[in-house]
């Protein structure tokens, strides 16, 4: 083969690879502020891009209401990492496919500051409690904990769980409902009660993501703990591992959304 033919073949091969690659938007539920979300999860999207040959682009939402409304439109989020109730919602109503989940389970904790002198959740009726807005799992747990509309705390709605905690530390809220894993980072917080555990967050894919790309992402996630690149990614995002899962794991959790505006 002459040099000209080799060069032509090389560029044709590159063009073929470029034609096969695609860009997919990856969003994470806005539990953290957008800048912290990027810092926390860019190692994951970079890893998936390297492993799949596609451009997995991290996008963020400023708050849960914006996230919820954008998600329901079904046109902007190709890949989503979020909680059990919204994962099940998309599986049931939007034909998403669950690819893998973070290992373990997760709960929420109702916390106060160390000087609040609160011993039971009912003592927060009529008092200020900070939480991300509906339909975050935290807010749904608050509503579940205080079902009587006449005997509820005064909700201080915030954009993310860090803001919830800061409201308590700054004395602008008596309590807050936050993911239990965050509580350990703040020794000033006192846990009043912890909710039932649910399956941990999962990554699900829109019907726009081809089956072969879904499989490539799934394989990259569940095998991450077995490779140096995957182990580095897991350490960077502070996840123990990803594990295989199915729709059955999340079946029924969408019922937590009943009564939510827009459900």
Whereabouts are the PLM-identified features?
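A ligand-binding cleft/hinge motif common to bilobed small-molecule-binding domains
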Residues: 81-93, 165-197
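Bacterial N-terminal signal peptides that target proteins for export
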Residues: 1-10
């Amino acid at each position: 083969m002459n040099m000209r033919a080799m060069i032509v073949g090389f560029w044709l091969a590159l063009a073929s690879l470029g034609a096969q690659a695609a860009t997919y938007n990856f969003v994470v539920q806005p539990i953290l502020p957008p800048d912290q979300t990027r810092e926390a999860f860019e190692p994951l999207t970079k890893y998936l891009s390297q492993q799949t040959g596609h451009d997995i682009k991290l996008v963020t939402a400023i708050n849960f209401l914006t996230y919820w409304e954008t998600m329901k439109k079904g046109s902007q989020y190709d890949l989503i990492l979020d909680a059990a109730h919204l994962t099940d919602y998309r599986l049931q109503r939007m034909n998403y496919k669950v690819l893998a989940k973070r290992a373990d389970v997760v709960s929420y904790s109702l916390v106060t500051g160390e000087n609040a002198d609160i011993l039971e959740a009912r003592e927060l009726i009529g008092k200020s409690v900070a939480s991300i807005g509906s339909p975050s799992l935290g807010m749904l747990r608050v509503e579940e904990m205080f079902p009587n509309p006449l005997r509820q705390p005064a909700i201080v709605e915030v954009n993310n769980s860090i803001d919830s905690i800061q409201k308590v530390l700054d004395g602008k809220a008596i309590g807050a409902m936050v993911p239990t894993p965050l509580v350990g980072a703040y020794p000033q917080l006192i846990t009043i009660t912890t909710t039932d555990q649910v399956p941990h967050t999962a990554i699900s894919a829109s019907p726009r993501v081809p089956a072969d790309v879904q499989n490539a992402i799934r394989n990259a996630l569940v095998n991450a703990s077995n490779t140096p690149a995957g182990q580095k990614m897991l350490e960077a995002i502070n996840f123990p591992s990803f594990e295989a899962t199915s729709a059955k794991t999340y079946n029924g959790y969408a019922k937590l959304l009943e009564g939510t505006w827009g459900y």
